[in-house]
Amino acid sequence: MNFYFELVAVFVAAVSGALAGRQKDMDFFGMYVVGVLTGLGGGTLRSLLIGDLPPPMFRNPSYLLVAAVAVVFARFGEPWWSKIRRVVSVVDAVSLGMFVSLGIRISQAKGLPWWACVVNGVITAAFGGVLRDIARVEVPLIFRREIYATACLAGGMVLLGLDALGLPKGIGVLIITVLITVIRLLAIRYSLNQSSD
């Protein structure tokens, strides 16, 4: 179950990365690199931290192939992206929610304590975006006042709470994916941020 869910999450995040690369006028190869970094960066770091070696992308070619399909989809679907920036934001928000739940579930399967599961959920969700923004020569969203990591953290805590209530795991994943997506989109829509004052 985790394998197929992760492939879907990789696809969604890689589309986000590829479109972000296209915003910077990158060619297909550049879009692919940024797509791979976005789709697989967070999961790879998570695997390194929990000792899941080698990381899945080096054990199964499906991950890189899915990223390639995502980039083709992003590149040739470009005529339909009337506002690429908005599409990137929406797709990125959806992938955040998916990756938080994925990182937490994989960490739970490794028997990690609850707080480590939440940390790994945030890392899985956010680190690909960090690499994407670095590749685009931008300050990563997570290091700005954007409600980004906070949304991931909140979603992770809610997921653990739903688990404690005995809710079916799949339902919990669906709920927090929607929750994190909505938080991010509201933050973008209404320019909500975390004040440094």
Feature annotation, model-predicted:
Residues 69-106:
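Ordered, amphipathic secondary-structure segments that act as subunit-interaction surfaces
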Residues 29-37, 59-64, 85-96, 120, ...:
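Cytoplasmic-side transmembrane-helix entry/capping segments in multi-pass membrane proteins
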Residues 1-4, 48-58, 103-116, 161-172:
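Helix-coil boundary and interhelical linker segments in multi-pass alpha-helical membrane proteins
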Residues 1-10, 36, 55-69, 113-125:
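Structural signature of hydrophobic alpha-helical transmembrane segments
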Residues 35-43, 91-105, 123-124, 147-160, ...:
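Small-residue-rich segments of transmembrane alpha-helices in multi-pass membrane proteins
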Residues 1-40, 44-56:
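N-terminal topogenic module of multi-pass integral membrane proteins
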Residues 14-24, 47, 71-85, 130-141, ...:
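C-terminal ends of transmembrane helices
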Residues 33-37, 44-50, 119, 123, ...:
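Short, structured motif recognition centered on aromatic/hydrophobic residues
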